[in-house]
Regions:
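Generic hydrophobic, helix-prone segments enriched in Leu/Val/Ile
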Residues: 10, 15-23, 120-128, 238, ...
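Metal-dependent nucleotidyltransferase catalytic core
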Residues: 16-36, 41-55, 60-111, 304, ...
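Short N-terminal helix-initiation segments at or just after the protein's N-terminus
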Residues: 21-29, 114-122, 232-233
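Conserved nucleotidyltransferase catalytic core and NTase-mimicking acidic/glycine-rich helix/loop elements
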Residues: 139-358
Length: 358
């Protein structure tokens, strides 16, 4: 049963035309794929009322099998010079959308259902909508935000690597899209309106005016260097804006063995590299040392370790001293947490202790 008038009160020419398209899809489904069509919904500008004379009809045509793709088509009506694309969607497509990998969820969430043939499919749609609502309220959404920003960084790197203005603009588009999605999901929201209303929806969020201004400047720029500069600014703002500080644990017995690992993995290799004047090996081992301490400090309240700020590629022996100084600082952290560093005079002392202790 069609209830198209539930959200369209005035029977205008466009409404009649849209109704004819929907009726045609239903009739064709009964003829060529009677078991395929599950339901039809309307979303986009026609559903929100944000239409103009060239607005087309966005439909959620939910199908149950590949036979349903017979309903898909694209066409242009010459009397109004409007193009239409009739897409078909499977439940798996909606399930993917419900994971919130992006914030363009209006098709899933806001489609006005005007025809239902399979009640089970409609019930599944409602469950997916509930899932999205819960997800956008959950802490899990912040993982999606990070994933989107990581994708934005990849596209930013592409923009720095490409020379052609057109390609840099395409890279910029991907950066902007990922960042906009990230900011919306961060606030537990999704885009309900079309592209032309993007800044209206962003204006409802507590972001700085500079955020939207940067996007406007990027899309209006003819200079690759300017685009890259603005993209960097946009990315840094978005990353800081969406940063979710989590409470860090106090150092505890969980860190037992980490000091010995830091010593074993890289300390003597840094010294060897210095003796051999091997700048590359020294660099890699110091970075690895810094990386492990950074990983620990991201989980535990042990302070910051900016070792590579002090790294000296010109005098490698300095790096041995730097390594030992930071090791000493970390040993104090372990001692304060009641962690005893395992040191033995020789291998026999180790074996004896190793075999005696459980």
């Amino acid at each position: 049963m069609i209830c198209y008038n539930c959200f369209n009160k005035k029977l205008k020419r466009g409404v009649i035309m849209n109704q004819k398209i929907i009726d045609a899809i239903i009739r064709k489904a009964k003829r060529v794929c009677p078991d395929s069509l599950a339901l039809i919904g309307i979303y986009g500008s026609v559903a929100t009322g944000d239409t103009y004379e060239k607005s087309d009809l966005d439909l959620l045509i939910l199908i149950e099998d590949d036979d349903g793709y017979k309903l898909a088509t694209g066409f242009i009506l010459e009397d109004n010079n409007v193009g239409y694309d009739i897409y078909c969607t499977k439940l798996d497509d909606l399930r993917h959308d419900a994971e919130c990998y992006h914030a363009h969820l209006s098709k899933l969430m806001d489609s006005k259902i005007v025809y239902v043939k399979n009640q089970d499919a409609y019930n599944e749609l409602c469950k997916l909508r509930d899932k999205v609502v819960l997800f956008l309220k959950s802490e899990e959404r912040f993982f999606r935000v990070k994933e989107l920003l990581d994708k934005a960084k990849i596209s930013y790197a592409d923009a720095c690597l490409h020379d052609e203005l057109g390609q840099v603009r395409m890279d910029a588009f991907h950066v902007i899209d990922c960042i906009l999605n990230a900011v919306m999901i961060y606030h537990g929201k999704y885009f309900r309106l079309g592209v032309k209303r993007t800044f209206d929806e962003i204006a409802n969020l507590p972001v700085s005016g500079e955020f939207s201004d940067n996007i406007r400047k990027i899309v209006a720029s003819n200079d690759t260097s300017e685009i890259r500069y603005l993209l960097k600014s946009l990315l840094l703002y978005a990353e800081k804006y969406t940063q979710k500080e989590k409470p860090k644990a106090k150092p505890s017995a969980v860190l037992a063995g980490t000091y010995e690992e830091l010593y074993s993995n890289w300390r003597n290799k840094v010294e060897e590299a210095a003796n051999n004047r091997d700048v590359y090996s020294c660099f890699v081992n110091m970075c690895s040392f810094n990386g492990m301490l950074s990983d620990i400090s991201s989980e535990f309240d042990i302070g910051a370790y900016n070792i590579m700020d002090e790294y000296n590629p010109e005098k490698l022996t300095d790096n041995v001293l730097i390594y030992d100084r930071y090791l000493e600082e970390y040993e104090k952290v372990c001692n304060k947490a009641g962690i005893k560093i395992k040191r033995f005079s020789d291998v026999d002392a180790f074996v004896s202790d190793y075999l005696e202790n459980q």
